[in-house]
Amino acid sequence: GSSHFIYPEASIDIQRHLGSDIVMAFDECPPANVKESIVSKAVERTNKWTRICYDHLKKTGPIYSWSQTLFPIVQGGTFQNLRKQSAESLIQFSSCGMAIGGLAVGEDKSAMFDTIALMDEVLPKDQPRYLMGVGRPTDLVKAMRHGVDMFDCVLPTRNARNGQLFTSNGIINITNTEHKDSFDPLDENCNCYTCINYSRAY
């Protein structure tokens, strides 16, 4: 492969050509447990980039026959003051939804949910909230209780690829030999199509 410098306008152009219904603003996601000053600079940069993305999206117009909308991405780590500042600065660029970024990157789980609870208070109630990178079923349910509507995460496909199933009793490693000839349901507490029609046997 080769190196490419991607700047905010280029990010918007790429998403325009992909035909994304939801175009994500360019953002900086700092790692967990860094100094507040570093996270503060990431918030400033994200705010600046979001303005550029917003202006460029308005200026360019859709390529295809449908409209595309911009989701700003709130940053700020687990610093409540920076999260609030980021959200309040970015609301002006949102008409259809906002993303909560920079979580599930190694921070303490309780700090993550404190931040999600703050976002429930600060973000518009009449727009979808998209929590990026969170995928454990128990975390999804808890986040939904705090007003989150949308999620994305590599976890379901990555775990499935490695033979893991999420069940109401925890994770099952389906490739373990104990399941090879087992006609037990995948999850005895679930009535979904898969659990009713497929067993653990393979």
What are these regions (language model features)?
Residues G1, E36, G102, G133, ...:
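Short, flexible active-site loop motifs that bind/organize anionic cofactors or intermediates
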Residues G1-S65, T177-K180:
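Non-catalytic, usually N-terminal nucleic-acid engagement modules in DNA/RNA processing proteins
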Residues D27-N33, D187-Y202:
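C-terminal extensions of enzymes
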Residues N47, H56, T60, S65-L186:
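Glycine-rich phosphate/ribose-binding loops and adjacent secondary-structure elements
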Residues I12, Q68, N197-A201:
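Hydrophobic/aromatic-rich, well-ordered segments within soluble, folded domains that form packed cores
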Residues P31, K35-I38, Q75, A104, ...:
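Residue-level detector of alpha-helix boundaries and kinks
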